[in-house]
């Protein structure tokens, strides 16, 4: 079942917690990293070094893979590639849904770009307007404060290395482990 922007807004309007987990070509490559030595090497070169900026140990790669599987198993909705030019993209983009499906416990999907689509058309910021608390995790700063939000808690993760010259703390395990502790400290009524 494919959900539209309006469907996602309706889900958000229920005011119940919802988990929307992204599944892109990098996630597909990580999920397949235990298929063969070639798959593992592709994961290291195309995802870990390129996106994260370093080569984690084999056990860390497997832990990341298992965390992805847990995320898909616990997701309410999974964001998958739905670009108009999907047929023209590489096999990793085209095969995302098939690779993630065995790990998912939901059949609800939406566009991998749903957050950006809603951010750019204004519907996401409108939905957040006047919320008492917003807790979000992102490598980008979103101007929620201008929406009259009383409290904004932002855990800023490292950006993808391929887009920046970032040399700070590693995504995994450093930031990953701190996020759970950070979330525990945030207001429970956050959105």
Spans of features found by a protein language model:
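Electropositive, gly/pro-rich neighborhoods at or near active sites that engage anionic ligands
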Residues: 1-154
């Amino acid at each position: 079942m494919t959900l539209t922007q309006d469907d996602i807004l309706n889900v958000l309007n229920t005011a119940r917690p919802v988990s929307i987990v992204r599944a892109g070509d990098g996630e597909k490559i990580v999920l397949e990293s235990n298929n063969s030595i070639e798959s593992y090497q592709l994961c290291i070169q195309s995802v870990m070094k390129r996106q994260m900026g370093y080569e984690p140990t084999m056990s860390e790669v497997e832990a990341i893979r298992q965390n992805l599987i847990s995320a898909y198993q616990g997701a309410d909705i999974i964001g998958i590639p739905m670009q108009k030019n999907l047929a023209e993209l590489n096999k990793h983009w085209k095969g995302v849904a098939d690779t993630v499906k065995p790990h998912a416990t939901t059949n609800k999907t939406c566009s991998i770009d749903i957050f950006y689509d809603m951010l750019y058309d204004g519907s996401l910021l409108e939905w957040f307007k006047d919320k008492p608390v917003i807790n979000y995790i992102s490598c980008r700063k979103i101007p929620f404060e201008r929406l009259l939000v009383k409290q904004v808690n932002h855990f800023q993760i490292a950006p993808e290395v391929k887009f920046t010259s970032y040399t700070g703390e590693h995504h995994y395990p450093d930031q990953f482990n701190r996020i759970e502790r950070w979330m525990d400290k945030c207001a429970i009524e956050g959105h």
